[in-house]
């Protein structure tokens, strides 16, 4: 905590304005590294793990410490992004007038007699160039083959070969402006299968707003130093042909850091998995000692596996704990192999990892205290202390769950003269399409209008919910309803539309189109309801898979939702709600 919150944060202000010399970064890193390994004045300490590995993310087996050079560049990239996106700020106007009056920051050059501040910001130009991406609105400002506009962090630019006469075409040429949707056939004709799917996954708004440059490193399209830092680290990996841990190892490391135990024990488990504990076997490997025999039982080399499971003292502790591993140990294993097996059995034995690792922690503390001259403790004491650690942690971190009163589990009628519209979406992955379903009812529960619509767009669940809501708002207006409650079973969409959270960059055109309609209505409200209270909308959205384009019902109840609507009304009439 001290390293991340203090030592690595102290130079942040300076690093956000200027590029620190590499030697200074190395000196700061050296001091931080020595502090971590406990070095004091005139005292040497062994660095068990390289600092490069310590700076890897926790999910990749590191400690998540910052690499100061990369962090410095990420902070400078923030200034570069401000020059790129905030053209009207005083900071941007001054630098633009002096260094790139006729171009953008990503196209600027160092120029003659540049200031140190400009040199520093320019060192992060490549980061800004790599991270910027166009968010498609109407597509009129985006070149199909020369601009980055695909929603992909790895390949945001079209790689499919040019097809004459499309070399200089713009994204707007792929959009059916009358329908506010992609020209599905044209997209499939021009691009590869995977790229066509990516294009069709971009939600379009019926209002077709202007295109905008966003940051590709975050879902909301806003620059963050954290995302820029990770981008820089990935760029460094690619240049050195390094490989990150595979998905299984990531799962293991994540499981370790999610243990419901104090941080000191999680760090201990991480060190044990990295073979960074000062066991006699590890010390012998580093030629610090010649003897690796276990000092407690004298029956074998003191490896982590021997110390925690095969040593006579460890066996006595485990016997008193009445806990047993749900698998057989192999003498050739290391500590990380045991952890991996425990992770595999965590679903069938919940809480077992926490209990076992807290007991390993007590065994390790006991071993160290005995080596330092303290008296031995009984095994029962170690077991009791380990159990107390788990209980105290759980008690301190117990969460009280409050039921959210803002949504209902069943449908209930609106107050007259208002109306209620249930809206839902369905994603048809096999057809690379989505369905929108909506039904509007009055205070008596009578169906006044309903619609289901199939859209050839390969959208995510949230994008599909937002697109359905946009269609629903326009449909309600066209049908003449001016006071409407719009109900959705997507809490994320409800939070976005009510201002409780920000929309992802890809959704901005759609949510902006929805919110632009608010002034037209005398009353409008967006509410969350659970799936049980949204059954008619859900059924219609699913039914859209069977229709060619759209089906509308006016002043009649569609047969497929008649039972669901009747059940909603009957529950209301009998006062269940």
Report each predicted region and the residues it spans:
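A helix-boundary/hinge signal
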Residues: 1-577
């Amino acid at each position: 905590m001290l390293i991340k919150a203090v030592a690595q944060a102290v130079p942040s202000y300076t690093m956000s304005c200027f590029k620190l010399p590499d030697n200074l970064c190395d000196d700061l890193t050296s001091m931080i590294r020595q502090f971590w390994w406990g070095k004091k004045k005139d005292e040497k300490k062994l660095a068990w793990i390289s600092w490069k590995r310590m700076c890897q993310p926790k999910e990749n087996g590191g400690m998540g410490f910052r690499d100061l050079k990369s962090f410095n560049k990420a902070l400078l990239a923030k200034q570069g992004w401000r020059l790129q996106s905030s053209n009207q700020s005083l900071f941007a106007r001054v630098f633009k007038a002096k260094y790139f009056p006729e171009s953008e920051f990503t196209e600027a050059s160092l120029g003659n007699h540049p200031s140190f501040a400009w040199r520093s910001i320019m060192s992060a130009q490549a980061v800004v160039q790599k991270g910027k991406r166009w968010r498609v609105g109407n597509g009129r400002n985006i070149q199909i083959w020369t601009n980055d506009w695909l929603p992909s962090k790895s390949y945001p630019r079209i790689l499919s070969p040019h097809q004459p006469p499309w070399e200089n075409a713009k994204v707007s040429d792929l959009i059916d402006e009358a329908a506010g949707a992609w020209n599905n056939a044209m997209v499939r004709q021009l691009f590869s299968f995977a790229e066509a799917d990516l294009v069709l996954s971009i939600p379009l708004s019926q209002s077709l707003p202007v295109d905008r440059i966003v940051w590709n490193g975050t879902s909301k399209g806003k620059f963050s130093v954290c995302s820029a830092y990770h981008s820089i680290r990935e760029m460094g990996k690619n240049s050195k042909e390094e490989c990150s841990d595979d998905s299984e190892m990531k799962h293991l490391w994540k499981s370790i850091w999610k243990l419901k135990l104090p941080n000191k024990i999680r760090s201990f488990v991480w060190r044990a998995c990295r073979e960074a504990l000062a066991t006699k076997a590890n010390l012998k490997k580093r030629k610090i000692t010649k003897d690796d025999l276990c000092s407690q039982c004298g029956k074998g080399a003191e490896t982590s596996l021997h110390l925690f499971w095969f040593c006579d003292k460890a066996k006595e502790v485990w016997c008193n704990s009445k806990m047993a591993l749900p698998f057989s140990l192999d003498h050739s294993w290391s500590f990380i192999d045991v952890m991996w097996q425990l992770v595999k059995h965590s679903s069938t034995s919940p809480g077992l990892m926490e209990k076992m690792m807290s007991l390993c922690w007590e065994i390790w503390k006991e071993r160290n205290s005995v080596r330092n001259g303290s008296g031995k403790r009984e095994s029962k004491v170690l077991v009791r202390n380990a159990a107390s650690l788990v209980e105290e942690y759980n008690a301190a971190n117990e969460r009280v769950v409050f039921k959210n009163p803002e949504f209902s589990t069943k449908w209930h009628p609106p107050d007259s003269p208002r109306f209620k519209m249930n809206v839902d979406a369905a994603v048809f992955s096999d057809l690379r399409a989505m369905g929108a379903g909506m039904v509007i009812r009055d205070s008596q529960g009578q169906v006044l209008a309903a619609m289901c619509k199939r859209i050839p767009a390969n959208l995510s669940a949230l994008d599909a919910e937002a697109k359905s809501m946009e269609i629903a708002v326009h449909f309600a207006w066209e049908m003449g309803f001016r006071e409407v409650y719009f109900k959705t079973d997507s809490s994320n969409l409800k939070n976005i539309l009510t201002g409780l959270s920000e929309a992802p960059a890809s959704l901005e055109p759609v949510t902006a189109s929805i919110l632009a309609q608010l002034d037209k209505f005398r009353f409008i409200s967006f509410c969350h309801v659970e799936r049980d209270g949204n059954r008619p909308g859900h059924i219609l959205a699913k039914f859209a898979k069977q229709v060619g384009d759209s089906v509308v019902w006016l002043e009649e109840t569609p047969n497929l939702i008649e039972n669901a609507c009747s059940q909603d009304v009957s529950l209301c009439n009998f006062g269940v709600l």
